[in-house]
Each structure stands twice: as structure tokens, then as C-alpha cells.
Amino acid sequence: MAGGGCAPPRLDGFVLTERLGTGTYATVYKAYGKRDTREVVAVKCVSKRSLNRASVENLLTEIEILKTIRHPHIVELKDFQWDSDHIYLIMEFCAGGDLSRFIRMRRILPEKVARIFLQQLACALKFLHDHNISHLDLKPQNILLSTPENPQLKLADFGFAQYMSPWDEKHVLRGSPLYMAPEMVCRQQYDARVDLWSVGVILYEALFGRPPFASRSFAELEEKIRSDRAIELPSRPPLSPDCRDLLQRLLERDPLKRISFEEFFAHPFVDMEHMPGPESFCKATNLVVEAVKKDQEGDASAALSLYCKALEYFVPALHYESDARRKEAIRTKVGQYISRAEELKALVASKSKNLLQQGNPAREILKEMAKDKPRLCAALEMASVAVAREEEGKDDGDTLELYQQSLGELLLLLAAEPAGRRRELLHAEIQTLMARAEYLKDQIKMREAQSMGKEALADSVRSSCTLQ
């Protein structure tokens, strides 16, 4: 956003124009290169007079880190210069503004849009984590968007960043209180996991329109941060089970109980495997080749599963593709694959009716034999609820979650069950439930793929992500 005040400083090779923002010891300007290319950049001008020892250390850290890393979701430091009055960081220009403004203009973001941004942020954090770098000041204001339309997230402002191994601990207060982990504010020891808390706050703000510790005064903010109460998630808007689980695990006050980096990167809501990228289309086409082969062999169930898996990559491929002609060609292919998957679904559905009838007599015998095992009874009852919901047509994520919870418990019980008739029945019941859960999972994926393909989700996400 342009601002008034004194004229921008002079920088050799560049013309500084509008002021984009002002911080504690720096002002950022939009600038144009004087060469033929007229390259557009952002120039961070740091007044030497404003620097104290701590800010000098922060600046040197930022330059050192940004000079040595290159990543598509981290703002690039192109060069740096200095004169008698200023130090200049010449950086990649991001025309889409910052994530804070993006959220504020929309009040809240749809979960699907928030997930795309989260995947990109996770991608940047994994790169930093692999290089033992912690940002320590993650907040929406430090997350820039590359363009107004179909933006790519760019992590910026590494003034507080540190080279930190997973076992390193710090004591110095860094970052912005609204987004800082409780262990930082309380001046206890902290480590790299503080960045995961900040990710949770950013995701919470994107989904609900405000950070969890939003306050009218610093005293109120401090009380909320120092409280032992668990973070409560609003009931509206409703979240998917995976999204809710991730938020709760990120916003765990106790860093020892908080989700780890490895668990975060592997979490199903983050789902880095299916984030839009240059390899999405290749992975999708490889799966289609396998699907066609299984289809020709007459294995309808395997073919359907492979088509569904391929569609999970085609959707991010659509989102990643910027060329309109290629995008339309992909969309046409996706439509054809969805049509074939629909035909296979009908074939598999007729076979699945037999599956729905399986296990009923054996299940009743197993329940009778489990009366002296309350834990087994409870797990079988949960499985029965899942089966009943599915037979009533409630073939949704809640039913699948019931299947998964009951199977998790039953598998543990099977491992401890001695040899005998009950163990045989339990093993057979688990096999039946696993088959039903797998079929239900394919049905859910199929519906999602249909929605994505037929309604051109990629374009709807793009319009949701476009700055007006």
C-alpha cells in the first residue's frame, strides 16, 4: 500500500516508487530496474541509524539465510547493497499482498483454499526444517502472495529466523505475541516446535477469521496465553475431521504433546503428496495406465480404485496448470475417466451388495462369545453402528471414521487374543470390515472426484483465491 511522507532513498540501478510497508527498522518499496528488462522488485531499506545490536544480528541472520536458500515458496533475496545511510535488501516482488490482507478481505477462507495455502506453507517449512532453520515469527503478515490471481504463497521476513537443530533450545523472546507459542511468551525454554504452534494459529485465523487469542488489550492477551485451558474450536463453520484433528494437535499448549514436524508433514490434511506441483500430472497419468490395464483384465474393483487415485492427482494438476489450452485438455480427459469410473462403480456396487450381507450370522456369534470382554463388545458395537449407517445410505466420512476407529481397536484385540474359535471369528470379522471400509473409502473418493471434475474445482478455487 502506498504511503506519504519523505521521498524514498536513491539506490544505484533501481528506481524506488511506492511504499509497500514500514516496520520497526525498515521500509519496503516497490522498485524498477533501470536496465532494459525493467525488472520489478521489492527493496527493503534499513536505516543504519535505527539499528541496535539486536536488530543488526537479525538483519545479518536474514541476509545469511536468504542468500543460501532457494525455494518456490520462500521469497528470494536477489541482492543486497549499502551506502552511508541505508542497507538495501533487493527481493522478489509479490504483487498479491500478504495473507493477512487476503483473509481480512474475505473474512474467512473455505477449507479447500486454506488447505492449498497450508500445503505450500508446509512445503516451505519442510525445506527449512531439513536445513535446521526455524522461522520464529510466522504470521499472516509475513506470508506474501505472488500474484493477485491464482497466487502462490511466499514465506518472508527471516529477521528472527535461527539455525536450530531439533534439540536446540532458546530463551530469548522473539516474534509476535498473537502468533507466538505459549512457551515463548512465558519465557520458558523453547525449540523449533514453536513454528508448528504458529502454523496452527495461522490456519485457525484463515478458517475462523481471527486468531484464537484475539484480545482487546495486552493484559487480556497475556491472560489467554498463560491460561492452561485447551484451545476450543468454534462449531461454525464446520470442519472436516482431518482439519479439526490437525488444528487441535498444532494448538497443543504443551510442546511435548504438540504434533511433531514429521507427524505434521505426514498428516492427511496437509497431504503434501497431493499438493499441486509439476509432478502431479505425471503421477496421475501413470495411475491411469495401471487403471486401464486392470480394466482390460476385468478387475473392476482394482480399476475403480486406481482411477480414483489418479483423479486425486489430476485435480492438483488442474490447479497447477496455468496454460488455458492444456488445462482444458486435462479437464476433458478427467471427464472421460470419471465416466468410465462411474460405469465401474455400478459393476462394483452390484458385487458389494453381497458384501453387505456377509458376516451377519458370524457377527452375532462373535458378539455372544465376547460378552465377557467389555472392550471387545464396545469395538464390535462401534462396527455395528458403522454397518447400520452404511446400510441406511449414510456412506460419508463419519461412517468411514467409525469403521477406522473400530478396526484400530479390533486389530489391537486380535493381537492379544489366544488361538481358538473366537479368534477365528474375530479375524474373519476384521477382514469383512476392512473390505467394507475400503469400498466406502473408494465411494467417497469417487464422489469427491466427480465434484472436482464436473464442477471444475480448479477454476472455483482460483476464483476463491483471486484478489478483487
Swiss-Prot record:
It is found in: Cytoplasm. The keyword Lipoprotein does not apply. Pfam families: MIT (PF04212), Pkinase (PF00069). InterPro entries: Atg1-like, Kinase-like_dom_sf, MIT_dom, MIT_dom_sf, Prot_kinase_dom, Protein_kinase_ATP_BS, Ser/Thr_kinase_AS. GO terms for molecular function: ATP binding; protein serine kinase activity; protein serine/threonine kinase activity. The active site is at D137. It comes from the Eukaryota. Gene3D superfamilies: Phosphorylase Kinase, domain 1 (3.30.200.20), Phosphotransferase system, lactose/cellobiose-type IIA subunit (1.20.58.80), Transferase(Phosphotransferase) domain 1 (1.10.510.10). Keywords: ATP-binding, Autophagy, Cytoplasm, Kinase, Nucleotide-binding, Repeat, Serine/threonine-protein kinase, Transferase. Its main location: cytoplasm. GO terms for biological process: autophagosome assembly; mitophagy; negative regulation of smoothened signaling pathway; piecemeal microautophagy of the nucleus; positive regulation of smoothened signaling pathway; protein autophosphorylation; regulation of autophagy; response to starvation. Residues 280-348, 375-444 form the MIT domain. Serine/threonine protein kinase that acts as a regulator of Sonic hedgehog (SHH) signaling and autophagy. This is Serine/threonine-protein kinase ULK3. The lineage of its organism: Eukaryota, Metazoa, Chordata, Craniata, Vertebrata.
